[in-house]
């Protein structure tokens, strides 16, 4: 297990982030997005007043899946997707592994992504170019996340089970889904088929 601190833009640029099938749907609402945007706005204000100010968004737990050359997000999915939606709005041309490989077949996830994207557009509609550029700069300098990387899938799932008390609590069926899917890590077809049936 290794841990390092990086800015959000570097997290998107340097890691082949993927949201694995065992993850629950994307559940963040407009209220969660509004709180996050306000936190970022406050961090931007603080960074203007205090030299070298950094705002730590939280921790992200990822499994380094070297066999498939990707980094599976084990914990922190809701924050990562939300931050990505904000950054993608600020720079519509931005391209990274996550933007090319994110696939949300779950209707709840799709609906929340659409709703939150619309809210982000509305929220920024009253901001000028300077304010938008300050947000971009914050993603590159001010906003940080602790990235915890594990190589062993079993260790990743053990940490996943212990970490889910943070953020939005997991439903019992989400925990059961994660528990059963982790036993299928050697058979990708079986896992994908099980996810389709589960959803």
Predicted regions mapped to residue ranges:
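Covalent nucleotidyltransferase
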Residues: 1-199
């Amino acid at each position: 297990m290794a841990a390092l601190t990086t800015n959000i833009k570097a997290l998107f640029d340097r890691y082949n982030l993927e949201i694995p099938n065992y993850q629950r749907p994307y559940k963040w609402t407009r209220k969660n997005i509004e709180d996050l945007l306000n936190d970022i706005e406050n961090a931007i204000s603080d960074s203007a007043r205090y030299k070298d100010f950094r705002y730590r968004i939280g921790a992200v737990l990822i499994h380094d899946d070297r066999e498939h050359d990707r980094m599976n997000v084990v914990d922190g999915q809701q924050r990562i997707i939300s931050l990505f939606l904000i950054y993608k709005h600020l720079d519509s041309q931005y391209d990274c592994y996550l933007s090319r490989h994110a696939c949300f077949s779950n209707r709840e996830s799709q609906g929340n992504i659409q709703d939150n994207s619309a809210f982000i557009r509305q929220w920024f509609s009253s901001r000028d170019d300077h304010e938008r550029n300050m947000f971009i700069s914050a993603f590159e300098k001010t906003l940080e996340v602790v990235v915890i990387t594990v190589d062993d899938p079993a260790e990743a799932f053990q940490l996943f089970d212990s970490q889910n008390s943070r953020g939005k609590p997991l439903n019992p069926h989400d925990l059961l889904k994660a528990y059963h899917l982790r036993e299928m890590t050697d058979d990708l077809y079986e896992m994908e088929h099980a996810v389709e049936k589960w959803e």
